[in-house]
């Protein structure tokens, strides 16, 4: 099996370079789901469904109504997914958008 081990973070700020990390967890998906993530099985299942495409995981649900305030939060994923290196970063404009778009992988 190809290794899958990630460090996931949520931070307050508009980029990974400047955001203060508020939470961080580990997630390993092979050979079995493990790590400090509160829902390892669900997060690994969501990653498998997207073929490890993190951009598909941070889509804001259709019909979501959020204010236009700028209070950014940034999520990151670093590590290895099915044998290939991953370095992902996405910034949500505000907490409402983050809640609507982060999915199971960034739910911690």
From Swiss-Prot:
Keywords: Disulfide bond, Protease inhibitor, Secreted, Serine protease inhibitor. It comes from the Bacteria. InterPro entries: Prot_inh_I16_SSI (IPR000691), Prot_inh_SSI_I16_CS (IPR020054), Subtilisin_inhibitor (IPR023549), Subtilisin_inhibitor-like_sf (IPR036819). GO terms for molecular function: serine-type endopeptidase inhibitor activity. Disulfide bonds join 29-44, 66-96. It is found in: Secreted. This is Protease inhibitor SIL-V5. It comes from Streptomyces luteoverticillatus.
